[in-house]
């Protein structure tokens, strides 16, 4: 045998030194579990070696073995430890399994479970309620609304609480397709949609919330009426058991729609603006994304001008109550047996309170009276037997132009309720006055409201926060109206029933004042979004082929959608005549 070359001799010696493993291949098999005398966990290919070992973490389910990958990803995220893929030699001995152990008892269990078979967890869709009765319409007449006892009723088309009957049956129901998107109650529309109405546009609240138009603070065009001084004694803390009663003061107040306003008609003839509206109507449109109750606005186009109007005794004439509450007040068709706490009754009560509260908190002193440039345009002393209410009508103009080439202006009639002296410089401050009313904090539909008599003084912030939640749309509208009028202070009164079971006797628990813009910031109210909505709706009407057309903007009663219809000439007049006939039939039936 020839001797191997010097380069291969070292390799041959290395191979000869390897142990003889027979038919196997690879390193020798060993059962040693120590490394230099230190025990260690065996290596597993399932372990991730990209992190430090955490020897202090325990497995979540009390087991050392890894579960399925899906279970690990769902429940054991960020809890993986090195060596978790193999059985640990440090695991304590398994205790005796006692899962099969049980105690036999012959005592009959009579306890009842809270949620038994067929328990109802959600309210189902209820039946459709009937239409509410409409109050007498005033037509185009400039009739005033009495704000005191014995005045005209504040009827209207308010239908805020109409909806489905609460499901109180014994059987539960299963969720179906898009049950989350179905309304909890079925309300009726504020106006009957006829078949010959043409649908122009359908806008949901998501699109409305994205609209934006920056504008200036506006300028005064003219002002009418007069103002009495605000009584600052109402700002003082109320002494317990010494609250002031809300008095029914008979004063002439007016709520004339846009196209019937003689001042707006004169401004339209002078081409002072393209869009005309009142603060009551404009605030509803600007706060549309917050509204829940159904409403409608009549829009008239005359040439290149747009008039935002309201129907007589429509929903806009009434002050809603707990419209935005999670469980709003129920109507009679929904099973409510408490007549004074139904939506329409609460709205009439709130409207009555607001009119009388504004008249009561002013001092009717001629020496402190502030007269505007012109007299009240709606008051006629020869026809009225009561004095006019303290009210100033300011006609203000806003620039809604989107380009320098084409200018678009809006004129709005705003209202101021009182005037007060600034404590610093003694200048007059314009004041708007509104009132929140407490009816029954323990009744259905109260929305978790606190007891004002015990909490208003100590937890005023919590009371206001609850009202912002339950009456978001109403408070937003009042704030917008104050900003449109360029008021310096917005006064909010807190009025409660003397007895929760009686809705015609009230007491004033306190008054709080805010700067309108500060209050808007607290409510996250963006006026630029409201101006964007107004300009968008006006542009849709101006795109119509007819220069003399009428439109109706309707809030869907059960969805967060606005629909714009173009209506034939005379369609709304026919409906008004039908309402008059219904009223006459009702009066004859009562007789």
From Swiss-Prot:
UniProt keyword annotation of RNA-binding present: yes
Chief location: cytoplasm
Keyword Protein biosynthesis on entry: yes
InterPro entries (UniProt xref): eIF3d
Basic and acidic residues bias (residue ranges): 55-67
Domain notes from UniProt: The RNA gate region regulates mRNA cap recognition to prevent promiscuous mRNA-binding before assembly of eif3d into the full eukaryotic translation initiation factor 3 (eIF-3) complex.
Subunit structure: Component of the eukaryotic translation initiation factor 3 (eIF-3) complex.
PANTHER family per the UniProt record, alphabetical: EUKARYOTIC TRANSLATION INITIATION FACTOR 3 SUBUNIT 7, EUKARYOTIC TRANSLATION INITIATION FACTOR 3 SUBUNIT D
Protein name per the record: Eukaryotic translation initiation factor 3 subunit D
Natural source organism: Neurospora crassa (strain ATCC 24698 / 74-OR23-1A / CBS 708.71 / DSM 1257 / FGSC 987)
